[in-house]
């Protein structure tokens, strides 16, 4: 009999607790989703490759709630920041992910770019000086001709405007019997992962 009374008492306590638990669950607010309601402002959207890691800071993250009110969120309290790649050094596009925490859920992204750098330090060393055609009447001659200051291990090609002279392996060779005239050598530095292409035209004069 005593055991029966204890059992009834336990059942009554459980029955009283169920509505309270349900009410607490109902009253607990659901997390607000950042998707479609969030604006991210980065300190910078574009960089130029400089062989160093480059990341923008997150200036502001604002959220528009159901009432239409815009709220400024706090990093660490309302969201965390992460980048799509561990290394942010090379040229390319990078994503910045804002992930909700605390009262907020979901995630939104923004992006920024690192542009290729220009080949600013390319110089063409040309030891050839304007020479009279009669100098090449009996035989051709070679002179130093090469591009220096090229970055990023870019491939360099030289294109001559005439078959009467050649540019190869850092030398320009004017062939025997070359005529008077103005010739050109086009120096092309190919683009690489982090550097844009570069082109320069050098004039060769035979008097």
Model regions: which residues?
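Serine/threonine-rich, repeat-prone extracellular segments and beta-strand-based repeat modules
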Residues: 67-105, 164-186
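Short glycine-aromatic motifs
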Residues: 32, 37-38, 77-80, 103-104, ...
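Sec-dependent N-terminal signal peptides of Gram-positive bacterial secreted proteins and lipoproteins
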Residues: 3-24
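Conserved aromatic beta-strand anchor motif in extracellular beta-sandwich/beta-rich domains
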Residues: 158-160
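Solvent-exposed, low-complexity, repeat-rich "mucin-like" stalks and linkers
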Residues: 25-69, 116-155, 203
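Interdomain linker/hinge connecting the two RecA-like lobes of the SF2 helicase core
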Residues: 151-155, 180-182, 196-197
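Enriched for extracellular/lumenal, surface-exposed ectodomains of secreted and cell-surface proteins
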Residues: 42-43, 60-66, 84-85, 90-112, ...
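Short, solvent-exposed mixed-charge patches
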Residues: 206-207
